[in-house]
Amino acid sequence: MAAFSEMGVMPEIAQAVEEMDWLLPTDIQAESIPLILGGGDVLMAAETGSGKTGAFSIPVIQIVYETLKDQQEGKKGKTTIKTGASVLNKWQMNPYDRGSAFAIGSDGLCCQSREVKEWHGCRATKGLMKGKHYYEVSCHDQGLCRVGWSTMQASLDLGTDKFGFGFGGTGKKSHNKQFDNYGEEFTMHDTIGCYLDIDKGHVKFSKNGKDLGLAFEIPPHMKNQALFPACVLKNAELKFNFGEEEFKFPPKDGFVALSKAPDGYIVKSQHSGNAQVTQTKFLPNAPKALIVEPSRELAEQTLNNIKQFKKYIDNPKLRELLIIGGVAARDQLSVLENGVDIVVGTPGRLDDLVSTGKLNLSQVRFLVLDEADGLLSQGYSDFINRMHNQIPQVTSDGKRLQVIVCSATLHSFDVKKLSEKIMHFPTWVDLKGEDSVPDTVHHVVVPVNPKTDRLWERLGKSHIRTDDVHAKDNTRPGANSPEMWSEAIKILKGEYAVRAIKEHKMDQAIIFCRTKIDCDNLEQYFIQQGGGPDKKGHQFSCVCLHGDRKPHERKQNLERFKKGDVRFLICTDVAARGIDIHGVPYVINVTLPDEKQNYVHRIGRVGRAERMGLAISLVATEKEKVWYHVCSSRGKGCYNTRLKEDGGCTIWYNEMQLLSEIEEHLNCTISQVEPDIKVPVDEFDGKVTYGQKRAAGGGSYKGHVDILAPTVQELAALEKEAQTSFLHLGYLPNQLFRTF
């Protein structure tokens, strides 16, 4: 308790932490908690299982509690920040809703960006919900630009998401990253008219008074959202006219200037100079902290940690909510209506609730992106940017938005780019460094060579069902084709997985497969061996964890594995990131991952908490043809076995190349063992029992002491001689030195 209290953690949280047997903070917690409590943005990286969740959860809970306590007691923050409310009272481009290199003149109408490599955008201070409206834009030079309309959710890069409509100088209209020919090109001295008919749901443009025709029909999901004038520039200058001055080309057909729009049609921007009116008012659906997780399992795990940490916090109590798919939305909405302080969720459902206004982000003080590299690799960068754009950078009490990013790979280009965009001078806490295999993990490779091990020929039909990639190919023995060897690899891997379990008498292991169908097939093969989900205690009892299983089943399967009801968890990489599974003695990689970082994530499941673990990877020596779905159904009902380059959904998978990349990444050569999977005892560890703690000190420590003993004795003799000499100099009758 004292260790956490010394970092400034409040006693109520420290007491809860002590009950969890956390006597001392981990390295990542000791570094990050004071930084976050101090108000800074933090980028943190540490090994899986190092306490990253606690490192951000503890300070977030404390600051949210302190904020609510201040509000309860009527305290106000000391702030000298200008509200910028006067900006919202006139039609102009919004200085609080623009890119970092986007300049706005003193009149609020003349805009410029001189960045030659990047696009920078801006939105107006007001938007519209009803009516037929028009504004003009004049081009002052020959730079590139797009003009049009967007919602508050849209990216400032107009036309690159589903919330904005743009028309560019190259004669292209753009929406949701789709650029189509429209109208004609425009450049310096041209005037573009931007028309919006909300009642009909139409957007169109004109050039120098020439009507270019219908450009877009507003989709249903945007019908109830305000649309704001918007633009994006690359080394260009524009001037807007919202109707305060006379139009060069006045609109017809009942379109009116924005400046003449009735007040009832107008919506003011949420970006109002950092202190929004809504922030001072209690909104039940406006949390103080938002934590985004890449998977439902991680979200549930984080929420459980928050519940444990806040156990003794009272007056006011903190209210948390889990927002994930697969759960009835009405249950989540009813909790939102009653008030919530901390939200933990996954991007899909969060996006739905934010876009429909059910979840309000106007009071968020903390934005936490857990496993950020996983979020980015799943394609959620646009969602993150949209969400960040909707959160005020400074709250009404003068506190700045804090952004915390946790990632297994901080040094990836995408994570660095994201941090530059949404974080404010972040502190990097990197206790992970380059990927490496922990000392407690013994990892080996088993080559799967169908040319030397002909077992697959003798099995007949009593083998694992394969993934039907070769359903239309001749894979019978004797064909000697790449397809035959590929099918043989699939069969052998099923046999080797069973052999590894029997050879090492595995009582618990995580088995990673590349695809969901591979997981299902291996589970079915274990059922044929007498095991399966319902055979508790059987040598091959197992459960599956992947995206096609129902949420309730996934949660139940994970719990059954943790409790030891079944021995094996067969999963895709969904379980490789952050899921709280401790001390698993074995991991089997049926197929190597296509991303080398995921190899470290996978084998990081074993050997935690000083327990020894063994990771066995089955690596094909020949290329294997595998599914790689690029179809819209993402594999559901797809049987297109042609190669990707031929318009199909398969690729040739080269595991030997992947193995060399992993070895280069880890700067080591991974030991190989024979197909009998008898793993020689590691010479450093002596006798090893996987899953048990290494003997403290070990035999190697004794040898180390023996080597150092003569040197230590010599140092002791020199120290004694020096001390004796000093005493003689100080106390001899004829002292040579005396202190006067």
UniProtKB/Swiss-Prot annotation:
What processes does the entry annotate via GO biological process terms? defense response to virus; double-strand break repair; innate immune response; positive regulation of canonical NF-kappaB signal transduction; positive regulation of myeloid dendritic cell cytokine production; protein localization to cytoplasmic stress granule; regulation of translational initiation; response to exogenous dsRNA
Catalysed reaction(s)?
ATP + H2O = ADP + phosphate + H(+)
Residues of the region (Necessary for interaction with HNRNPK) are 1-295, 525-740
Q: What is its EC number?
A: 3.6.4.13
Q: Which residues form the Helicase C-terminal domain?
A: 493-681
Residues covered by region (Interaction with dsRNA): 1-448
GO terms for MF:
ATP binding; ATP hydrolysis activity; chromatin binding; DNA binding; DNA/RNA helicase activity; double-stranded RNA binding; exonuclease activity; nuclease activity
| Glycyl lysine isopeptide (Lys-Gly) (interchain with G-Cter in SUMO2), cross-linked positions | 281
Residues binding ATP are 46-53
Q: What ranges does the record give for the region Necessary for interaction with replicase polyprotein 1ab nsp14 of IBV, renumbered to this chain?
A: 536-631
Q: Which Pfam families match?
A: DEAD, Helicase_C, SPRY
Q: Which residues form the B30.2/SPRY domain?
A: 70-247
Query: Which GO cellular component does the record give, naming just one?
Result: ribonucleoprotein complex
Q: Where is this motif: DEAD box?
A: 370-373
Please state every residue range assigned to the domain named Helicase ATP-binding: 2-428
Q: Which keywords fit this entry according to its UniProt record?
A: Acetylation, Activator, Antiviral defense, ATP-binding, Cytoplasm, DNA-binding, Exonuclease, Helicase, Host-virus interaction, Hydrolase, Immunity, Innate immunity, Isopeptide bond, Mitochondrion, mRNA processing, Nuclease, Nucleotide-binding, Nucleus, Phosphoprotein, RNA-binding, Transcription, Transcription regulation, tRNA processing, Ubl conjugation
Which stretches does the entry tag as region Necessary for interaction with RELA? 1-525
**Chief location category:** nucleus
Q: Where in the cell is it found?
A: Nucleus; Cytoplasm; Cytoplasmic granule; Cytoplasm, Cytosol
The protein's job, in short, is: Acts as an ATP-dependent RNA helicase, able to unwind both RNA-RNA and RNA-DNA duplexes. Possesses 5' single-stranded RNA overhang nuclease activity. Possesses ATPase activity on various RNA, but not DNA polynucleotides. May play a role in RNA clearance at DNA double-strand breaks (DSBs), thereby facilitating the template-guided repair of transcriptionally active regions of the genome. Together with RELA, acts as a coactivator to enhance NF-kappa-B-mediated transcriptional activation. Acts as a positive transcriptional regulator of cyclin CCND2 expression.
Quaternary structure? (Microbial infection) Interacts with Venezuelan equine encephalitis virus non-structural protein 3.
UniProt remark on domains:
The helicase domain is involved in the stimulation of RELA transcriptional activity.
Q: Which family does it belong to?
A: Belongs to the DEAD box helicase family. DDX1 subfamily.
The protein's name: ATP-dependent RNA helicase DDX1
Q: Which organism is it from?
A: Homo sapiens
